[in-house]
Amino acid sequence: PTIIEENNPVGIETVSAGASKNLTDILTQKIEESIGKENTEGFRTLNGQTLINAPKPEQLVEDLIAEAQKNFDPESLRPKISDASLKISEDNSREAFIKYFESFNKILLEASKNIPKTLFDENKMSISDFLKTKVVYEQATNSFYGLTVPRSLLDIHKKELELLLTKKNVFEKMANADQDPMTAFLAVDELLKIDLEFATLKADIEVWIKENKL
């Protein structure tokens, strides 16, 4: 068996393109509902002319998203991982590497069991799933902070933490969709990008393991 399990996605779970579209559909509806609440009067009459408080929700959503994208910085979702916050060991023995990757696997596989099964079921998904998923990522990152890492694996460790925390932050924004649907909508776009980075990281880990004959 390999050090990194074949079924270990490194990022706990992945988001398909179809699931991502479903997420944006849900959040678009939230934005439209928000617009509706702010324009409860609908049509009104002034000097004999019928006026509407807002354009069609669909067009307004597009306009709002375009404007919000100018002010949304995806990098704000990404934390900076400092060496001082980590448990770094100078033991770079084969045994230390194996122990690290065994713990690495255990953290992620245990976390994957706690992801809500309804998260990417288009018929059952709800915003409450986002909060539950955010908590799963938070717990996983806490475990990684508590994990002792051999210095030779520090870059891998920091990248894993960065991506886990970024995904936690994305789900946190999504969980707040009732209060801030626009930011939640924009945050969803980052999910597929993060998963691509997780895939790259997994490939890098596999190369490292092969080169070090673990």
Q: Which residues make up each language-model segment?
A:
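C-terminal amphipathic alpha-helix
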Residues: 53-123, 156-214
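N-terminal Sec/ER secretory leader and immediately downstream segment
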Residues: 2-93
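A loop-to-helix transmembrane entry motif
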Residues: 126-131
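Short, solvent-exposed, charged loop/turn and helix-capping segments
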Residues: 140-158
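Amphipathic alpha-helical packing segments from all-alpha helical-bundle domains
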Residues: 132-140
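Extended aliphatic helical segments
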Residues: 10, 15, 61, 135-136, ...
